[in-house]
Amino acid sequence: MSDTVTKVVADLNAAILQKSARAIAEVACKYSASDREKVRAQYRSTYSIEPDDHINKMLKGGDAATIVSNCWDELPVLRAKHLSKALKGSVDHRALLDLLIMCDREDWNNTVVAFTQQFRKNLPEELEKALKSTTSYRAFYTTWIKFDRAPRNNINGDALKLKEAFSKKDEQTVFDIMSTTVESEYKAIATQFEKVAGMTMIQAFAALTSGPLYWALHTAHYRNIGMNNGAAFLIHHACTADKKGDIARMTRLSPLLCDKCLNAKNYYSEFGDMGKDIVNAFKDAVEEVLKVLWRV
């Protein structure tokens, strides 16, 4: 962080007192989650209020205020809150893509701790309970949240193994490869699979399954290529899947990933223009905040 924590705290306070969601976003977008956490601690010490609470008090609600206040929340706690909500009643499948697929081992471990502290429950157990009636879907997420990835140095072998697994509808082998392959190998495996199988990974997923499991695998494909690719894919769907834009998805993704996925706007070119899609999908203050956070 090039500026001192004290200066950033003062800048953030000034933005909050302006009651400007855009100004608050402009401060947030300059810093990583770890730097924002330092600012958050100093803000609390200086003003005797958490910055996210101060934002909510001054801006008095609304989607834009929620997005920028979440940028100044403790992110493992924020992810835990989102997951608790997603697993209650009818499972929010879109939220699981945002919160579990777009997650790494460190984020997951911190979220499990935060979930236990917040709700006195074990997150993996709660996930399994919520998905108890969907065997294959549950098996995928149970495998995914192990976050046990390592190079195998066998691109062609993995491609052939996938070809056989898809042909035999061996879902668990597909889940294992999708959940354990490292980013540096996955794209090459997917490319080689297309050569040996005569279809893309996306086509293979569609032949294997449908519904939430298909979308989990589809999202995992882009995330395995890279976090920026995964973010671009999900933002594209947030902008185009619903007539008014999926504000809930952007509320989840933006605070958690805007610092990690600085190049998402460039990878978005596969789907269109992120800036234009945000303008078309969202309005007024929300549009402004999202454009600032995603640098478009």
UniProtKB/Swiss-Prot annotation:
Highest taxon above the source species: Eukaryota
PROSITE patterns: ANNEXIN_2 (PS51897)
Pfam families: ANXE1_4th
GO BP, one annotated term: cytoskeleton organization
UniProt signal peptide: none
Annexin repeats: 3-72, 74-146, 153-222, 226-295
GO cellular component, one term: cytoplasm
Gene Ontology MF annotations: calcium ion binding; calcium-dependent phospholipid binding; phosphatidylserine binding
Keywords of this entry: Annexin, Cytoplasm, Cytoskeleton, Microtubule, Repeat
Keyword field contains Cell cycle: no
Entry-linked Gene3D superfamilies: Annexin
Subcellular compartments: Cytoplasm, Cytoskeleton
Stated role: Giardins are involved in parasite attachment to the intestinal mucosa and in the cytoskeletal disassembly and reassembly that marks the transition from infectious trophozoite to transmissible cyst. They may interact with other cytoskeletal proteins such as microtubules in the microribbons or crossbridges, to maintain the integrity of the ventral disk.
UniProt family annotation: Belongs to the annexin family. Giardin subunit alpha subfamily.
UniProt-recorded name of the protein: Giardin subunit alpha-3
Organism expressing this protein natively: Giardia intestinalis (Giardia lamblia)
Lineage per the UniProt record: Eukaryota, Metamonada, Diplomonadida, Hexamitidae, Giardiinae
